[in-house]
């Protein structure tokens, strides 16, 4: 696939502050369970929609505050269709779900509640990556934030579902990938025979230099290696996009120092909303509900760049002499091509790694 790095950079810059996402709700067999990211909900929701960027952080398990149980637990059974509903700001029809520049895979893990809360026992039950020129995030946006799996035939008990997005618009540098995840509390009421395998630790299953974490979407590539373990062969889960995992080598990425903060700046506090309709599926009340912090709305500061922190880069090979055409690279760290743009254009610095010829 030939990727136009210039257009991707512009798209990323345009979406600078219109970017992040969290899971707002869950559907069971196409029945809306109501908002789950409220203080009395069933999702272990973070205080805002900022991503996790340090794959060794304990926040990788269920995001910030993820060790605290939610107030409710959804009752499900083997074979049920579970749909996770992602959003940027709200469930309104105008919501953009997640920035279209935030390309990457969508996955779902599952673990027994006690083990999963402690960061162990996580089993991947679904994954979508890159296939036929389309990313899983493209499909997620097209489906209005919805991504579905099927409940495996596991023994009865309480479990956590962990949907995850990895946004790779800054994945060309170490520490640049942005990970979004929450944990949804469920109680499996059917009593199946497919015991979950030992699973992996989260954090622990990813490293900052994994080919699917350190991945340059601005270079030409034909395939993408989804990080983490393989999908459990005892899972009945499929995925809504049908993308598959591949072991092809990732395109070359630029190595840079990791960001000083393990979390990218918050853009919007995760809103607490009220839901008048009662969920169609019964829920189990937890002993101590948690409070979703929304009193302070973080302020987003827009800075020029090809990604949220202004540090994304686009790699290209260009002649050292001559003039550079519109939207082509004209400068930046490790760039050795011409820095002279065609007449009527100027070489604009989007970030230290990428300068581009645009209209003056």
From Swiss-Prot:
Disulfide bonds: 62-183
Amino-acid positions noted as binding Cu(2+) in the UniProt annotation, renumbered to this chain: 20, 102, 180
Enzymatic class: oxidoreductase
Alphabetical list of Pfam families matching this protein: AA9 (PF03443), CBM_1 (PF00734)
UniProt-recorded Gene Ontology molecular function terms: cellulase activity; cellulose binding; metal ion binding; monooxygenase activity
Domain CBM1: 322-358
GO cellular component: extracellular region
Cofactor: how bound: Binds 1 copper ion per subunit.
Places the protein is found: Secreted
Signal peptide location: 1-19
Cofactor(s) required for function per UniProt: Cu(2+)
Gene3D superfamilies in alphabetical order: 2.70.50.70
Region described as Disordered: 254-293
Enzyme Commission numbers on file: 1.14.99.56
Amino-acid positions noted as binding O2 in the UniProt annotation, renumbered to this chain: 169
One of the GO BP terms on file: cellulose catabolic process
Biotechnology: Lignocellulose is the most abundant polymeric composite on Earth and is a recalcitrant but promising renewable substrate for industrial biotechnology applications. Together with cellobiose dehydrogenases (CDHs) an enzymatic system capable of oxidative cellulose cleavage is formed, which increases the efficiency of cellulases and put LPMOs at focus of biofuel research.
Highest taxon, organism lineage: Eukaryota
Similarity comment: Belongs to the polysaccharide monooxygenase AA9 family.
UniProt remark on domains: Has a modular structure: an endo-beta-1,4-glucanase catalytic module at the N-terminus, a linker rich in serines and threonines, and a C-terminal carbohydrate-binding module (CBM). The CBM domain is essential for binding to and subsequent oxidative degradation of polysaccharide substrate.
Job of this protein: Lytic polysaccharide monooxygenase (LPMO) that depolymerizes crystalline and amorphous polysaccharides via the oxidation of scissile alpha- or beta-(1-4)-glycosidic bonds, yielding C4 oxidation products. Catalysis by LPMOs requires the reduction of the active-site copper from Cu(II) to Cu(I) by a reducing agent and H(2)O(2) or O(2) as a cosubstrate.
Protein name per the record: AA9 family lytic polysaccharide monooxygenase A
Organism of this sequence: Aspergillus terreus (strain NIH 2624 / FGSC A1156)
High-level lineage: Eukaryota, Fungi, Dikarya, Ascomycota, Pezizomycotina
Encoding gene per record: eglD
